[in-house]
Amino acid sequence: VYKRQPEEIEKIVKAQRIAERAFSRLLRDIKPGQTEKHVAALLEYYMAEYGSDGKSFDTIAASGVNSASPHAVPTDKKLENGDFLTLDFGATYDGYHSDMTRTIAIGKVTDDMKKMYDAVLFANLDAMKAIRADISGKVADSVARSTLDAWGFGKYFGHGLGHGVGLEIHEAPSASPSSQYTLKEGMILTVEPGAYISGKYGVRTEDMVVVTNDGCRNLTNTTKDLIIID
């Protein structure tokens, strides 16, 4: 159940590639002084231009203090030097959705910001190493959580690790502390650990994987190195 046929995975990958092309184009256009609303609208426009049938969900563009809210709605806040900017977005192709998140930096980052970024990155990588057929969604989530704990950010991770993606943007299975699912070959799952310090900033790094018998295949091709917009 919730296993994807190869042709379904192909459509999800097509949606994902559209989103990634739009993101790489957006990176050339982002500059301080633009509003979150402007950035979100630009990303949605580029996805449409590259063949998306419509956005997968309302694009999140959350900068500075707003990045500390996992479900932030774009505002008129302007991007400033020293901000983190979290972009969570997806395209659709023939009814199938994609989902990815990258947190980037506007101008220079502090050592504390870099540490949070690295903690979330390693939580993402460690969870992806653990994901394979027949482990539970609960275990996958706990791997990311223990990595964040080790870095001192565990208490700032206030949501589940991930969810299925398909004809809906949120589907089974789930990976969270309360997940009842066992992962099976062919399931698609997001891997999206985050850390959010209220009143300061937050980071989330999200990839989409397909579960295999001996691991998982990442459907996301975009770098996870910290991108800094100068």
What are these regions (language model features)?
Residues 3-230:
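Active-site neighborhoods and metal-handling regions in enzymes and metal-associated proteins
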